[in-house]
């Protein structure tokens, strides 16, 4: 039987703007990716942010766990759980790499075109809500 793959996405804020990375197709997303075997949500989030955005981060809490087929398009053929993780930036800077061509911080009102397979504008808005909350409760499907 099929079991879900797990994806982690990092929410990193600076001056009330969220960090997004632009991929080779021109679309933007929260830094993140598939959780590899032997990785945890915590360790994978750190790894993916370092690879895609050049930053070292400290994951602080899980914002949400979403079922991809309910919220993202197009849906995958297999089940996917998407985790959104609030992270504190520690150090580092962006370097172009094989996965991403640039990174930038965006206000909620100025979000660029998104790769909605990875995250939707509504999911980014949820990250802003968590950022503004002093007592966030993890949301899950």
Language-model-derived ranges and their functions:
Residues 1-9, 15:
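Acidic, metal-coordinating catalytic segment for phosphate/diphosphate chemistry
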Residues 6, 31, 79:
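Exposed loop/turn and edge beta-strand positions of beta-sandwich/beta-sheet ligand-binding modules
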Residues 9-11, 19-21, 83-86:
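Short, hydrophobic/aromatic-rich beta-strand segments within well-structured domains
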Residues 13-51:
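Conserved Nudix-box catalytic region and its N-terminal flanking loop in Nudix hydrolases
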Residues 35-61, 67-127, 135-141:
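Unchanged
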Residues 132:
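Aromatic-lined ligand-binding clefts that engage carbohydrates, nucleic acids, or primary amines
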């Amino acid at each position: 039987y099929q079991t879900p793959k797990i994806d982690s996405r990092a929410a990193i804020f600076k001056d009330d703007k969220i960090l997004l990375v632009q991929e080779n197709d021109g679309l933007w997303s929260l830094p993140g990716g598939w959780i590899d075997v032997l990785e945890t949500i915590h360790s994978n989030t750190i790894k993916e942010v370092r690879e895609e955005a050049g930053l070292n981060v400290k994951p602080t809490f899980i914002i949400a766990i979403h079922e991809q087929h309910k919220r993202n398009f197009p849906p995958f053929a297999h089940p996917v759980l998407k985790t959104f993780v609030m992270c504190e930036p520690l150090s580092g800077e962006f370097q172009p790499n094989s996965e991403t061509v640039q990174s930038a911080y965006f206000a909620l009102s100025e979000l660029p075109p998104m790769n909605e397979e990875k995250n939707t504008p509504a999911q980014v808005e949820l990250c802003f809500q968590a950022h503004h909350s002093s007592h966030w409760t993890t949301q899950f499907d």
